[in-house]
């Protein structure tokens, strides 16, 4: 059946309130969209990452009269509240979503493939990964930068720390590329579960250890450390992240905008000889080799 979509303009502070109001008026589901195409600056753990200007979108049955809902938001936020009402044609939305994702190649050897697609090269290093709740499918420039970096390493027999593991994509890729052991760390229990499920799907669950920050091992001496968690946490957690690598280990950081790269390069330069910065779109990857 067709649908009616109501978009309400919100701020980072009001987006959750608007979402709850739309749900209360019968929207199923509610989604968030960046209203100005600006990047999200990831906050520290416990904070909610949202854009400064956010569109909150509620999907309603076609028979729904949008006028009372619009009037409700005008009463709460004023007559000039930004909104848009759209009629959406009936589609197989699951199929539409699935059609958006295709196998992607990173570097020379590595492919990330949704489970419903044929593997383009059976002889390549193939990671089977479906989009889900946790961050990391290969479509975002930061993930792509890290995957390309991993593809260029000799990981045979190595221990890898994936700090902010999300979907587990980087750690799983490292294992498929020859690493012997991966330690994945994330603040989100959903990410830990997603990483576990994806590792099982790829036959590497026995080689990946997954921890919330409070449970992470303290005596790790990894050969490779990768952290794709954005600038704020990279800055605050720098001593911890750097400490996971043994002398001579390799490190890659991403989730960093070009404007943020110089500060982080200076911070991590205390422990690492830094490589030239890699840039994809407006995002950067910093990498280096640990002193000693």
UniProtKB/Swiss-Prot annotation:
Write down the Gene3D superfamilies for this protein, in alphabetical order. Vaccinia Virus protein VP39 (3.40.50.150)
Q: Which InterPro entries match?
A: Ribosomal_L11_MeTrfase_PrmA (IPR050078), Ribosomal_PrmA_MeTrfase (IPR004498), SAM-dependent_MTases_sf (IPR029063)
Per its UniProt entry, which superkingdom is the organism in?
Bacteria
- What top-level class of enzyme does the UniProt entry assign? transferase
GO MF annotations, alphabetized: protein-lysine N-methyltransferase activity
Q: Could you list the residue ranges forming a coiled coil in this record? A: none
The EC number of this protein is: 2.1.1.-
Transferase found in the keyword field: yes
The reply to whether Transferase figures as a keyword in the UniProt entry is yes
Binding locations of S-adenosyl-L-methionine: 143, 164, 186, 228
NCBIfam families assigned to the protein according to its UniProt record, in alphabetical order: prmA
Q: Which PANTHER family match?
A: ELECTRON TRANSFER FLAVOPROTEIN BETA SUBUNIT LYSINE METHYLTRANSFERASE
Which cellular component appears as one GO term in the record? cytosol
Name under which the protein is recorded: Ribosomal protein L11 methyltransferase
Physiological role: Methylates ribosomal protein L11.
Q: Which reaction does it catalyse?
A: L-lysyl-[protein] + 3 S-adenosyl-L-methionine = N(6),N(6),N(6)-trimethyl-L-lysyl-[protein] + 3 S-adenosyl-L-homocysteine + 3 H(+)
Traced from the root, the source organism's taxonomic lineage reads: Bacteria, Pseudomonadati, Pseudomonadota, Gammaproteobacteria, Aeromonadales
State the species of origin: Aeromonas salmonicida (strain A449)
Localisation: Cytoplasm
Q: Could you list this entry's UniProt keywords, alphabetically sorted.
A: Cytoplasm, Methyltransferase, S-adenosyl-L-methionine, Transferase
The Swiss-Prot or TrEMBL record describes its family as follows: Belongs to the methyltransferase superfamily. PrmA family.
Query: What HAMAP family does UniProt report for this protein, alphabetically?
Result: Methyltr_PrmA
**Biological process terms in GO annotation:** methylation
